[in-house]
């Protein structure tokens, strides 16, 4: 009976430790960009585990002054995303537009992308020895570019 209690305590302790050290968390960052032709609201949900970023979900809403401006913006965005997906993989995106409003959704899974190809597009990326972003470094980068992160 005493051995069973000891084994139960050990198993529970290991489960708790495993949960604490493998806990998946996220932060959100938002940025609003405005000029005379359009307003862009960007929302980033950054998932990390053990301080390493493994996925980012991006949702952007664009409201343009005219349909032509929106079409140009959305075409540029879609071309960029298409190139990223072809070059680095695991870059899932969706682009929608209606009149003068557009929406994009992107999911970047850093565990599945070709990081060498990614670095060609993002040579300034500050990655750790595992070729991953550290959550604090990525948060700092977004904040330096005007985003508010929580």
Describe the residue ranges of each PLM region.
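Sec-dependent N-terminal signal peptides of Gram-positive bacterial secreted proteins and lipoproteins
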Residues: 3-22
